Design a protein with these regions (language model features):
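Small beta-barrel nucleic-acid-binding modules, primarily SNase/OB-fold domains
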Residues: 1-178
Length: 178
């Protein structure tokens, strides 16, 4: 169901975190922010919110090669600078790097996290307690895998982003925790 753009301008109250995902909930007003810069395929800077990390998805790192660059380019196309997005927080609002963890909604109501997953440009990354939309995101990733979209189009993609960051494959270096 498309969420009309006008809903984003109504207010900035967040939906009840404990409520199930329903059409009624999706029509609830969301907080909004304006995209100012795309960092990579799963993070962007957003007005006064600061760095936003898309929940439940993990894009290849830019240093991983073309896959990382493709994911960033796709996010730039979906939510270019100046796009006002609706944002929804799950249980844990920040990650270990102090990025705001959010589900982001495009002006037409599509969930940005899910769109990146459905395009096959990210893997699913579940970190409890943030699991509100896990079935939805995992389903989109599974659909992309079955239809061989994005990362799944060839057998070349063999290093999950989290493994790359940990230095377990592809020449990545472990990233220090803060």
């Amino acid at each position: 169901m498309a969420l009309p753009f006008a809903i984003f301008a109504i207010g900035c109250a967040r939906p009840d975190e404990a409520a199930a995902t329903t059409a009624v909930e999706q029509q609830s007003p969301l907080a909004t922010c304006t995209v100012t810069r795309i960092s990579d395929g799963d993070s962007f800077d957003c007005g006064s919110t600061g760095r936003v990390r898309l929940l439940m998805v993990d894009a290849p790192e830019l240093a991983q090669g073309k896959e990382g660059r493709l994911a960033k380019a796709a996010l730039e196309r979906l939510a270019p600078r100046g796009t006002v997005v609706g944002i929804e927080t799950d249980v844990r609002p920040k990650d270990d790097y102090e990025r705001t963890l959010e589900y982001a909604y495009l002006p037409d109501g599509r969930m940005l996290n899910e769109e990146m997953a459905r395009a096959g440009l990210v893997t699913a990354l579940v970190y409890p307690p943030n699991v509100k939309h896990s079935a939805r995101i995992r389903g989109a990733v599974r659909d992309a895998q079955e239809k061989k979209r994005g990362l799944w189009a060839t057998s070349f993609f063999d290093c999950e982003p989290r493994d790359y960051r940990a230095g377990r494959c592809g020449g990545g270096r472990p990233r220090p925790r803060r």
